[in-house]
Amino acid sequence: MAGWLSISPELGGALGAFTDAVYNRNRLPLRVREIARTAVAEANECAVCLGTRDRSGADAGIDEHFYDHVLEWESWPGYSAEERTAAEFAHRFATDHTALRDDEDFWARCHEHFSDEILTDLALSCALWLGTGRVLRVLDIGQTCKLTL
């Protein structure tokens, strides 16, 4: 899967650095990151993204039930309020970004759980997942792969 990045070495290298920053340098708690990532993956219908798991997940209380219920982020009792808010942000980021921008009630709720710094990390992470997931899906790259980070 990584081989396709070598076709465009400058952009591929930049995407690799951005990916590294999202997965290894952001400040999101792992469960928050994973619910947001998976919500974007659902919106993108990206099989490789949906099949990706973090090897540290079990230590953070993430099991397959966590992933199985991402589409039920509003109601599944296994998610915290912070995780629900991250899932809502990610879902709306991927499906209706202008309404998200204008939803003052959402932003008030969001600031109950996240600082501006964490929101910035969440938004930039969603940007990576949305863009990369769509590239993978549109070009049919790795759609049968399962990855462990």
Predicted feature residues:
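Short, thiol/selenol-centered motifs that function as redox-active sites or metal-ligating centers
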Residues: 33-56
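Acidic/His metal-coordination segments adjacent to aromatic residues that form catalytic metal sites
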Residues: 71-79
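Iron-sulfur (Fe-S) cluster-binding segments and ferredoxin-like electron-carrier domains
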Residues: 12, 50-69
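Alpha-helical scaffolds flanking conserved acidic
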Residues: 29-37, 66, 84, 118-121
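Acidic/histidine-rich alpha-helical segments that form the ligand environment
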Residues: 80-123
